Amino acid sequence: MNFFRTILFIIILNIPGFAQDYLPSMDYSAMMNIRYYENNGGFLIETVPIFFPPEDMSSVEFEVATSSGETKFKKNVYVNKWQQFPIVDGIRPQGSGNIKLKQAGDFVLRVNVAGKEITRIPFKMSVQNSGDPFNPQSTYTKEGPWSKLGYISVNPERAEDPITFNWWGRIGELPNGKGGMMTVQIMRSGKEVAVSKGSFISKKSWQSASRKLKQSGSNSRNNFTLADLTQNDGTYEVVLKAGDKTIRTYIATVSGGKLQHHPRSAMDYSPHADYITPKVIYNGSGSASNNKMMDAYWVETK
């Protein structure tokens, strides 16, 4: 199946002008998952997938800038060609991808092509000092889309697999302000239809988490699949909890028997820099040869 899909991609991409019909876009989840260091307000940019890469990759660059436009980091990229995905390349900064901001303020993390941003993650940085003159320490925290967005991921080649919910959490959201478990519930008309096991949250800054869903009640051993979710039209609540405390609630919509994508995932969404890719590249092993392209249905807090 994967072989024939790859051949089809190659045939399509050899149609003159096909690749240029779509603007380049970064894997939004991978951008949000760029490694972050609380002790110095720093990032470590490693390989990030780019969809519909431009023909001239020399014009692609990573940048971190202030909201006023002052550049703090800017580098061109190395390109890793992924043969299993002709419409996707992996890119990483040339040289070190290490950035140490060490300052509060409003910033944007973005990728530019020929000087024009194609994907951006705006964020606000704040600093908390320990207040201990004998052990002076600072912790830098960032605020941005991590508190508002999550996504349901589905393997399009395995309809029998459970759906997975992916989100970002931090210990400040937990009842005791320390490390602990977060779980996911899916509710319809006030009734729980699916639930997950817990995911341990241990970081002060935003930590990515994901959990597969099981059916609730007497069918709790059964996977909760995309077909289960879409058998009834309506509004669903994806509830993130820590014990009995509701952390936040995301809204998902099923219409016409299909799970609806976020408005920002429309291919013609404008401004394009705020477009959210409805596909994500998943890798559970660390080897690029094991990358999988998953469907991503992004949801937002109500």
Model-derived features: positions:
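Sec-dependent N-terminal signal peptides
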Residues: F3-P16
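Contiguous segments within soluble domain cores/interaction surfaces
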Residues: Q20-N112, E117-F123, P133-K302
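Alpha-helical membrane-associated segments of multi-pass integral membrane proteins
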Residues: S126-S130
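Initiator methionine at the very start of the polypeptide chain
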Residues: M1, A19-Q20
